[in-house]
Amino acid sequence: MEEEKLERSIRKSEIPGLTREEEEAQLAKVIGIAEQNLEQAKADIRLANEDLADLMETYDAKEAEGLALWNNATAKLNAYQHGMARLEKARKKPYFGRIDFQDPRLSFLESYYIGRVGISDEKAEPVVLDWRAPISSVYYENSTGPCSYTVSSEGTFSIDLKRKRTYEIENDHLKDFFDSDVVANDELLTKYLAKNKKAVLGEIIATIQQEQNLIIRRSPKTNLIVQGVAGSGKTTVAMHRISYILYNYEEDFRPEDFYIIGSNRILLNYITSVLPELDVYGIRQMTMEQLFIRLLYEDWDEEKYMVHTCLLYTSDAAD
């Protein structure tokens, strides 16, 4: 798969420029592609709605065949709607970063923009990479120079990072951009927070720190415990980790495989409202009290949850 991507990139004859004028032209180009994709998504949703309406007129929901067709059509419609939601988010701020690098397997420089969601042109060539893509980790973890990224089940690839650029884009307009030797991610985060004390999630994605990124991208096949003081970003990292796992391990994990356990409903409601911003839907949640009730009354397994009684003795001296 990775080799196929590299072969496709060989056909790219143009690398985006470095000046402000060239960057503004590139932004306009990407926004144009995003708008085309958005119009196509709207057309797909209209057709999916028509197909669902036809099925409802043709089949009775009580029929096994009809119910199966209804469910498939509904799932297809939901997928289109989620896709359109992603495109709408990318429309006014399609990307926040860029990496230029040399792959030793190729004889030319490669360049990729990184955003909250991936954007592809009509030929299915990526013009913006999703922040959860394996190679996007280079943007978060490395300074310029030799580095590497890992693709699950394919191995680790070494590259030479030539440039890491961060963009400040608002409502279709390029306000500013910085190279890694001018401003670091933590400085950019400080700038965002100074502008808006309650930074929106899209800006947080752009300013994920190296240590946070390592936690987010760690393999889900092993247990992971993250400790930190209140307000240190544990919940934010956990939400991004769920999004990353569902994106990169879709054959192994589904949304219903996750449970978010919180101390109160206020926290859980906040998490539920934020997860769709990370392209995550259908995650189940419960409070600690609900968890204990479920363990005691719904999922109780005498062999798994054994209660051992014991007697405590106190000596006369202790009395």
Predicted regions located by residue number:
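The conserved Walker
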Residues: 230
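Conserved Walker B
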Residues: 318
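Phosphate-binding P-loop
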Residues: 215-221
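Motif I (Walker A/P-loop) of helicase-class P-loop NTPases
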Residues: 238-243
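Alpha-helical nucleic-acid-binding subdomain
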Residues: 246-315
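Walker A/P-loop
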Residues: 235
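Extended, charged low-complexity regulatory segments
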Residues: 1-205, 209, 213-214
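Hydrophobic anchor at the beta1->P-loop junction of P-loop NTPases
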Residues: 226
